[in-house]
UniProtKB/Swiss-Prot annotation:
Transmembrane segments: none
Main location: mitochondrion
Subcellular location: Mitochondrion
Highest taxon in the source lineage: Eukaryota
GO terms for cellular component: mitochondrion
Keywords assigned by UniProt, alphabetized: Mitochondrion, Transit peptide
Statement: the UniProt record of this protein carries the keyword Transcription: no
InterPro entries according to UniProt: Kinase-like_dom_sf (IPR011009), Mito_inheritance_9 (IPR051035)
Native source organism of the sequence: Saccharomyces cerevisiae (strain RM11-1a)
Transit peptide, UniProt annotation: 1-43
Name of the protein in its database record: Altered inheritance of mitochondria protein 9, mitochondrial
Family: Belongs to the AIM9 family.
Signal peptide stretch: none
């Protein structure tokens, strides 16, 4: 018998193994931090009964609710998989671990493509990582615990009779299998590269499958379980200067910066994303750069282990399942020559414009049910075509005005989720591990945006007393506002100071003119909603105002701003941007696209602050105006 557990926000769930052979125990608790002390609900199910309806609660999304289309959004995140199939895969890798025990010490073998349509990273599948059982005994899953329901994945902890725990990552089926296949293949290869070549501590991956044809019946990654605490536990962005927790604050900045330093330490030979070289046997060789991923490798086991292929950066794949992959997407995904760094920006713009055009065509043909105003899509086309048009001129790649320009343009590994929430410090050795590499790609450091946990685009305040006139005479409310700006400025400054300590040749990437030049591209990469194309326009219009100065200083390629905006264009943009800001301010939970953490949602619903409508949507009850 196996037992499985649905834990809440808790990163760790410790439960005893069931002694009832052939069944699994399921434990479900509330999905929030404040409720993790609640006694979990336990359900037993037979290992061989994949159709047991009692399992469904284990696979359902529970960490939040949506104000609109709640049922549909949760159904998109239903992660049912075959527990029996998982058990078979664990037995397979256990057999492989015994075979690997005979391999020469230090030998790094290539990934093995198994007959069951999974891939094993056999260099990680060794007895010390997998564990041991008695002779003639079979590997048995004893407990399954759902420990995290993130934006893109459901994370399960798998306890076994090997005296080892594993992590099973199941991506939500938010996109088609082709998208998930590229994403998983690249992420696994990138983590392997980070481990073996860059010396970054990552959870060891043992096995993965890129579609639902494997025994798990879902795309999956099976990897090492790291016992520990998230680095986020020590991060307080609003800490007072000189606080007793200053050392923790400084350590978080240091740990994340050290990871970044290792990620960008090696100059690569193309822009795109990393894959295993033996992925070539099942793919189109034109997808991959033929030359070595980097120069100077002397270890024969690492030579030709990886290749650069199409970029899996999220913005290039998000909401594009309706496009013809080979005709409408592939031409814009790279890989790109290291001689053409601005092609990344150009192709991002062209792909998004193609996406908007296709959506308009589908809507006009009556084959799309999405509720989107045609004007918004038409405006997106104009915006993204402008981004593609200006891309070759955004940076003068031969300028001497920006120190170390060629260093800034070289392909380097970029991690999109470099964040203390994505770093775990293991319990025993207190070593930091970088967890999730989804969407990692190689691109110039000059186009890499700052980590979100320290990013700040507001007014900069470096000293409250010097920068703010009569600060001491302000009201408490005004002081709090300025203190917030100061602390956000301080956080970003501390991050950039650490970047200068670790990588002084790259520090000019955070110079204000350079940030402004890349801002249209960053706005495109970070766009979350349909209306946020306006933020790209805003960045382009800001560039228009200073373009002459940049041209005089040899920062850009063209003396004249490459785009044309009429007075009416600018007035319409100002009006639309104002409406967007008003919408963000007036619409509850607009920043999370209507998603609410489940404990907060339950409290608001029970108090009457949220009201369910007849169509299943929810509205936030506005407070009555005082007389």
């Amino acid at each position: 018998m196996i037992r499985y557990t649905v834990a809440g926000h808790s990163r760790r769930c410790v439960v005893g193994a069931s002694k009832r052979v052939g069944a699994i125990k399921c434990i479900t608790v509330a999905a929030t931090k404040r409720f993790i002390s609640n006694k979990p609900n336990e359900v037993f199910t037979k290992l061989t009964n994949d159709n047991d309806p009692k399992r469904d609660a284990f696979f359902k999304y529970t960490w939040g609710s949506w104000l609109k289309n709640d049922k549909q959004e949760k159904e998109k995140r239903f992660t049912k998989f075959s527990i029996e199939g998982l058990n078979r895969i664990l037995n397979d890798i256990y057999i492989q671990s015994n075979e690997m025990a005979k391999a020469p010490d230090g030998k790094i073998l290539p990934p093995v493509f198994n007959k069951n349509l999974t891939v094993s990273l056999v260099n990680n599948v060794v007895p010390k990582n997998i564990g041991k059982i008695n002779p003639n005994e079979k590997v048995q899953v004893t407990t399954l615990s759902s420990i995290h329901e993130g934006k893109h994945h459901r994370i399960y902890k798998v306890d076994t009779n090997l005296n080892k725990a594993f992590i099973l990552r199941i991506p939500y089926p938010l996109e088609n299998e082709n998208t998930l296949s590229y994403r998983i293949r690249s992420e696994v290869a990138t983590m392997d590269f980070a481990d073996l070549k860059l010396g970054i501590k990552v959870p060891k991956i043992f096995c993965y499958g890129v579609n639902s044809l494997n025994p798990v019946r879902q795309p999956f990654v099976l990897q090492e379980f790291i016992e520990g605490e998230l680095l986020m536990k020590d991060w307080d962005p609003l800490i007072e200067d000189g606080s007793s927790n200053q050392k923790k604050y400084d350590n978080v900045i240091k740990q994340v910066s050290d990871f970044q330093s290792k990620l960008v330490s090696l100059k690569l030979n193309a822009f795109g994303s990393i894959y295993f070289n033996n992925d070539l046997k099942d793919g189109n060789e034109k997808e991959f750069v033929k030359e070595d991923i980097y120069d100077g490798e002397t270890n024969p086991d690492l030579q030709n282990r990886w290749k650069i292929g199409p970029s899996v950066e999220r913005c290039l794949w998000r909401h594009k399942s309706h496009l013809d992959f080979h005709k409408q997407m592939k031409p814009f995904l790279g890989p790109w020559s290291k001689k053409s760094p601005m092609d990344i920006i150009k192709n991002t713009g062209l792909l998004e414009a193609e996406n908007a055009k296709t959506r308009i065509a589908m809507k006009e043909a009556g084959s799309s049910a999405e509720l989107m105003y045609p004007r918004t899509l038409k405006e997106q086309i104009t915006t993204y075509e402008n981004l593609a048009k200006i891309a070759p001129d955004l940076f003068n790649v031969k300028t001497k005005a920006i120190p170390n320009m060629q260093e800034l343009l070289s392909p380097r590994l970029f991690h999109p989720d470099l964040d203390p929430m994505n770093i775990i410090v293991n319990k025993e050795a207190q070593e930091a591990y970088l967890l999730d590499f989804e969407g990692a790609c190689t691109k110039p450091f000059i186009l890499q945006n700052s980590p979100q946990f320290i990013a700040y685009d507001g007014p900069k305040i470096y000293d409250l007393k010097e920068d703010i006139t009569d600060f001491d005479k302000l009201s408490e409310a005004e002081k709090v506002q300025y203190q917030f700006m100061y602390k956000r400025t301080r956080n970003q400054h501390q991050w950039e100071k650490k970047l200068n300590d670790n990588n002084p040749k790259l520090i000019t990437a955070v110079a204000p003119p350079v940030k402004l030049l890349r801002s249209p591209y960053i706005a495109a990469v970070e766009r979350k909603t349909e209306e946020e194309y306006l933020l790209i326009d805003e960045s382009l219009l800001q560039l228009k105002e200073v373009w002459d100065i940049f041209a005089q200083n040899d920062l850009v390629n063209q003396k004249k701003f490459p785009l044309n905006y009429s007075k009416e264009d600018i007035e319409r943009h100002v009006e639309d941007l104002q409406k967007l800001h008003e919408k963000l301010i007036s619409t509850p939970f607009a920043a999370t696209q209507g998603w609410i953490p489940q404990d907060m949602f339950d409290q608001l619903l029970n108090s009457g602050s949220i009201v369910k409508q007849e169509n299943g949507d929810y509205t936030v009850k506005q407070p009555e105006a005082t007389k």
